[in-house]
Design a protein with these regions (language model features):
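Single conserved hydrophobic/aromatic residue that forms the stacking wall/gate
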Residues: 1-5, 9
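Class I SAM-dependent methyltransferase SAM/SAH-binding core
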Residues: 30-32, 36-83
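A short acidic, Gly/Pro-enriched loop at the edge of an enzyme's catalytic core
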Residues: 82-93
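A short SAM/SAH-binding and catalytic strip from SAM-dependent methyltransferases
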Residues: 93-106
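A short glycine-rich, Lys/Arg-flanked "PGG" loop and its adjoining helix->strand segment in the class I
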Residues: 107-119
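Conserved class I S-adenosyl-L-methionine
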Residues: 122-156
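Short alpha-helix
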Residues: 176-193, 198-199
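Core SAM-dependent methyltransferase catalytic element
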Residues: 209-227
């Protein structure tokens, strides 16, 4: 990750960890859907004891490469985010980013994450209402406005530069695409007995101005859930 992005997320995560667990030391952290290791590296730099979980072995190899010297201190586990193959009550902190919306069984995933958290541990889930515009005329209008404003500003369009139709086909198969989030997540987590705090728009805190323009209609949120 870039130095600027790492610093921003590190501050976001560690501030909330300190608020939720002010007296806890030696934080055991689990990065679920670790991908290329963005969060794993940040957590390692922050002094956490880190486990990185991903189902893709090629991505695990990339994460190790990206971590450099930190890789020796990170425990890499190949496994399913919906059925985490780790002991019950073993982590103080779980972090995940841009993952939940892609899961076929998000309720199952949340239950699995709760299982591996220690009592008093916290989940920090960074995500957004990706592709909700497929199910809402109002959101579609806001999405179209974003594309116009990005073009007018002459900045790189992060949607048009991708295979939008392919991404939309995938999104239509995902159960969370039509849901209003993070309200949906709050309800599910509270029904499981978690204490939930929502930060419904943190885009200004974690995105560059160009990114904020691209995703104005789809702000990043953070779900903090304490066991």
């Amino acid at each position: 990750p870039s130095s600027a992005a790492s610093d921003v997320y590190k501050r976001q995560i560690m501030r909330r960890v300190q608020d939720a667990m002010p007296e806890r030391e030696g934080i055991k952290a689990l990065d679920i859907g670790a991908g290329p290791g963005f969060f794993s590296i940040i957590l390692g730099m922050a002094g956490c004891e880190v486990t990185a979980l991903d189902r893709n072995p090629a991505m695990m190899a990339e994460a190790k490469k990206n971590a450099g010297p930190l890789a020796e201190a990170i425990h890499y586990v190949e496994g399913d985010a919906e059925d985490v193959p780790l002991p019950m009550g073993s982590y103080d902190l779980i972090v995940t980013r841009n993952l939940t919306w892609t899961l076929p069984h998000p309720k199952k995933a949340y239950a699995s994450w709760q299982r591996v958290l220690k009592k008093g541990g916290i989940l920090l889930n960074f995500d957004a209402n990706w592709y909700n515009y497929l199910y809402s005329e109002e959101d579609r209008a806001l999405y179209d406005r974003d594309r116009e404003q990005v073009a007018e500003a002459g900045v790189f369009d992060r949607y048009i530069s991708t295979d939008v139709m392919a991404c939309e086909r995938i999104a239509r198969q995902m159960p969370l695409s039509p849901k209003k989030r993070p309200a949906w997540d709050r309800q599910v987590l509270e029904e499981m007995g978690m204490q939930v705090t929502l930060y419904e728009n943190i885009s200004e805190e974690i995105l560059l101005p160009e990114e904020q323009l691209n995703f104005a209609a789809t702000p990043y949120f953070c779900i903090e859930a304490k066991k």
